[in-house]
């Protein structure tokens, strides 16, 4: 063949070398390298064929040359119509593996896609990469059988692949993952399947190899992806064959011995085209299934919608010239849409594994004879796509193919109807395959080929409700054979679509019982009582009659489960199941029992008592409640949601005589160890819970012990007795009057007031007033008593009480004067301006706090020399203040040194008297700081101002300057109920450790420990009870 003809310009992408006539010279190699360097931005090497050597390569050593045309600038040549004026010739090209060059190594490190698509020698699978180019790149090659006698050189053919994603326009679609999985096949015909693409152009690569492995290079494509594409789209390729080599469109049936089962591998050959009209709609890109995201390995057959719509390998007749590119693109798009409705089974698909590096594939020779009838049946029936197709699904992070091992699936469908039997050879790793062409919804229904023992295949439904996925035909078992040594049978992956859920099963519970009581009837068991949501079945026997009573749960009113803890009856059962039936259901009960002893007029027939063999377990009790809850929900009877207690059930039948109800006659009477006739006494006993009886059970028990002929007796609390809180429900009783008579103004404390001393309760005003009086009279020193006055807890409430204006005598009075008139009688016997400390308990919004008016007779702060006793107290407060300041001051070094100097000077000058500050102020001691302090202080200032006018007959202004308000830091409460307790403790601590120096600031954080508050309630309770006993003794004397 001529290298080039005159008048024809050689394409830049064509690399032509002669076979045995002329070896590639260094100059040619330099040209090749230069061409590759120019296209460095668009080159993507993905072929691992460089490692396919020797007899394992599908390239026959007898063939010395191979031709490939990579023309990116001739769209018509790429479409199958050669340029006019050019002579017809056969080109031969030596494929170069870019992975061995520096440029290839660079791309191998940077590009994310590292796998290559390998094909069997008899078929080239071309999947369209997600392209961002407007051009549609299609490559179609056929190898001429005329060159089958030529021998290829020793060098292994290599393929240069171009990835359009590396262009400037394609980079913005890099986020779309590529979906290119190839299939291995040893069929004799060429088939090209195309994935749905999201780009404006479709990438197709086609190769056709005959059974003699002869090759013919041509530019015309032959799209055979769908059966809807007319034959005219492949006409140009057929005409080119006829012109160049005279090859007829009919291809001879392959001979089994000519097949090389070990040859695998083919890379994509991509060609660019400038046709911008050939495009898919963008909406199709949104539904493109991304197979690379499927990491799961499984085994399954193919759904009809999962199979690509690829035409069968039938003889194609050459008709006419190919239409324009836009027409071809439209037909391809229509065929892609129809592929989800009427799929045809793809032939000769084989699973393969893709690796970032080239992977060695070792083939296992299989000399099986073809099965013509099986293959022809698969080719003729579109309903057997599950048996004749397999899809490849490869995870980019998993390595499937192992070096030296391979998986081969051979299928053939020759025109004459002859075929060969498909054979599957497995590798050391499970091979995951999926369809090469999937619809927009199939990514949710990933079907996977399952590897298991020979002649067995199983499917698993994943993400779909179609029952056809769980069905396997006999043809699938015949077409796929898997060795069992590497992949044993796994029953865990079987189809579980027919498993019935546990929720559909009814709840059922059985009890072993000893007796059943229905009205006057007592029966012995003949089995277990069964509880379900629909019925309750009770098998029993009365005399010689065996009865199986079935109670409809819709007629059940209440149920009860009672257990007795009485040790006296330990020989008997301690569990009773109680069923209360509807009165209109008694006729059906009588019909089932066939006993004239039952009377519909008797209320006792509504009750069924089941004496259980033993106490039921907690699990059985919970299940019984679940069944009753289901019955309650089903029938709308809310009473069945909880069991009926014995106390509520006893009044239902306690008025019945033992002759009417056998339960009272047999079980209840014997359990009480009383005569049968004593019906009135029997009703006072209970099986499980104490009834409303006058008999009081002792709360103690005797323990007897014999030792050395002597008996010892001890009394302890009954272990069965439960401690309950005792609440006095009787009349209110006055416990104490404090101070007791003959002192006037005594305050009475009742038993109701004592209850507020329980933990978590709020203290009422009676307890507050009682303890304040007690502190003033019993705890305070005589000096403090003379200098102090305590108002009642009602004082501030009366002072701030709102009254109707009509009740006021003089409407011209100010607000402060009106308030003072309400409490003017509270100080008629005392002058508060002669006191140093006036305590005012305040309650606002159920919160107690204390207000202390200090030195109301002073108009400004006064400093006095304190006596020796007060000086020691003052020094303690000062040291406490210094310690607090040391903790709060960040400059601790200077503060500590200053305190040390002060202490030294104090020790030296002990004889020097200290000054004590008396400041008129209002102290607010609040354990929660939740009150409106400013309003309280202002109300007290206004009261003092009016009281001063009344007592001193002069006017004096109590303002913020001469009567300041102070809020010292005091111990705080840690709950929401101890505010009253803290108020009492503030007053008690004030009397025990009074504030002698009012120099600011005043720190009282460590005024008293916290544990004092924890026991304060109990201390007050004991005090009241102690006073109660004292006053009772005094009254009795």
Curated annotation (Swiss-Prot):
<feature type="region of interest" description="Disordered">
    <location>
        <begin position="1"/>
        <end position="27"/>
    </location>
</feature>
<dbReference type="InterPro" id="IPR003653">
    <property type="entry name" value="Peptidase_C48_C"/>
</dbReference>
<feature type="modified residue" description="Phosphoserine">
    <location>
        <position position="25"/>
    </location>
</feature>
<dbReference type="InterPro" id="IPR051947">
    <property type="entry name" value="Sentrin-specific_protease"/>
</dbReference>
<feature type="modified residue" description="Phosphoserine">
    <location>
        <position position="434"/>
    </location>
</feature>
<dbReference type="GO" id="GO:0016926">
    <property type="term" value="P:protein desumoylation"/>
</dbReference>
<dbReference type="GO" id="GO:0099524">
    <property type="term" value="C:postsynaptic cytosol"/>
</dbReference>
<dbReference type="GO" id="GO:0005737">
    <property type="term" value="C:cytoplasm"/>
</dbReference>
<keyword id="KW-0833">Ubl conjugation pathway</keyword>
<feature type="modified residue" description="Phosphoserine">
    <location>
        <position position="13"/>
    </location>
</feature>
<keyword id="KW-0963">Cytoplasm</keyword>
<feature type="compositionally biased region" description="Polar residues">
    <location>
        <begin position="891"/>
        <end position="909"/>
    </location>
</feature>
<keyword id="KW-0645">Protease</keyword>
<feature type="active site" description="Nucleophile">
    <location>
        <position position="979"/>
    </location>
</feature>
<keyword id="KW-0597">Phosphoprotein</keyword>
<dbReference type="GO" id="GO:0005634">
    <property type="term" value="C:nucleus"/>
</dbReference>
<feature type="compositionally biased region" description="Basic residues">
    <location>
        <begin position="290"/>
        <end position="300"/>
    </location>
</feature>
<feature type="compositionally biased region" description="Polar residues">
    <location>
        <begin position="272"/>
        <end position="282"/>
    </location>
</feature>
<feature type="modified residue" description="Phosphoserine">
    <location>
        <position position="435"/>
    </location>
</feature>
<dbReference type="GO" id="GO:0099523">
    <property type="term" value="C:presynaptic cytosol"/>
</dbReference>
<keyword id="KW-0788">Thiol protease</keyword>
<dbReference type="GO" id="GO:0070139">
    <property type="term" value="F:SUMO-specific endopeptidase activity"/>
</dbReference>
<comment type="function">
    <text>Protease that acts as a positive regulator of the cGAS-STING pathway by catalyzing desumoylation of CGAS. Desumoylation of CGAS promotes DNA-binding activity of CGAS, subsequent oligomerization and activation. Deconjugates SUMO2 and SUMO3 from targeted proteins, but not SUMO1. Catalyzes the deconjugation of poly-SUMO2 and poly-SUMO3 chains. Has very low efficiency in processing full-length SUMO proteins to their mature forms.</text>
</comment>
<feature type="compositionally biased region" description="Basic and acidic residues">
    <location>
        <begin position="880"/>
        <end position="890"/>
    </location>
</feature>
<dbReference type="GO" id="GO:0140374">
    <property type="term" value="P:antiviral innate immune response"/>
</dbReference>
<comment type="similarity">
    <text>Belongs to the peptidase C48 family.</text>
</comment>
<keyword id="KW-0399">Innate immunity</keyword>
<feature type="region of interest" description="Protease">
    <location>
        <begin position="747"/>
        <end position="1037"/>
    </location>
</feature>
<feature type="compositionally biased region" description="Basic residues">
    <location>
        <begin position="1"/>
        <end position="10"/>
    </location>
</feature>
<keyword id="KW-0391">Immunity</keyword>
<feature type="compositionally biased region" description="Basic and acidic residues">
    <location>
        <begin position="328"/>
        <end position="341"/>
    </location>
</feature>
<feature type="active site">
    <location>
        <position position="847"/>
    </location>
</feature>
<feature type="region of interest" description="Disordered">
    <location>
        <begin position="873"/>
        <end position="909"/>
    </location>
</feature>
<dbReference type="InterPro" id="IPR038765">
    <property type="entry name" value="Papain-like_cys_pep_sf"/>
</dbReference>
<feature type="compositionally biased region" description="Low complexity">
    <location>
        <begin position="192"/>
        <end position="208"/>
    </location>
</feature>
<dbReference type="GO" id="GO:0006508">
    <property type="term" value="P:proteolysis"/>
</dbReference>
<feature type="modified residue" description="Phosphoserine">
    <location>
        <position position="12"/>
    </location>
</feature>
<feature type="compositionally biased region" description="Low complexity">
    <location>
        <begin position="379"/>
        <end position="399"/>
    </location>
</feature>
<feature type="active site">
    <location>
        <position position="926"/>
    </location>
</feature>
<protein>
    <recommendedName>
        <fullName>Sentrin-specific protease 7</fullName>
        <ecNumber>3.4.22.-</ecNumber>
    </recommendedName>
</protein>
<feature type="compositionally biased region" description="Basic and acidic residues">
    <location>
        <begin position="301"/>
        <end position="321"/>
    </location>
</feature>
<keyword id="KW-0378">Hydrolase</keyword>
